[in-house]
């Protein structure tokens, strides 16, 4: 297992690699991550849609959703929320703020396209027909729950969510084997879903799928509009994710492990030999 200091140093190299990807590769890998999270979203809703006890339904959905993060970490993709940790490389002056923001933008675009792609295919494929169209109602309810949040609530839930998501990514870097990555990343992701915190990329899927399902199945949901989804929900959730991931986890761990202990490729060569950075992609 890698120590927290090794994880921090490793992520500097990972951050350098990420920001130097071409725009095409960044968007393409972002598309894959968006799809993976979208698959987790529909699976989570399907698993919990017919369970009458709300807390049990929430637990079942939370138990299923981490499959999306597992695919992101192991299959190779770029997830906006996890990439908030690039701030470590910025604070170490190995990456410019501009390059980090550019990466975030194109990954975010790719994530949206991937999540929306899954949402469209779910509706076109009539997946919401399951369980006598109970799944259709559950999909719309999931989207409406997000658009019913106040801007402040959405922002705070976004902060809480990405603290856990970035901790999941951080913990996965401690593992040297795939099994370890899956096990360590599972619990923080399960917790954020169970607690009802908001993940911007997951909400891209939930929002688009909810809007399309409501239209296709004639389900009325007054608060479920494109404006409410994009501006009232997704925007503050995204900003909250940045605060939680880059501000709290990224800056916090930089202060704990790297501040006044600058990264040096020469002094940590032996440590870096043990870390297979390529497996993160």
Give short role names for the model-derived ranges.
Residues 1-281:
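Alpha-helical transmembrane segments and their helix-helix packing motifs
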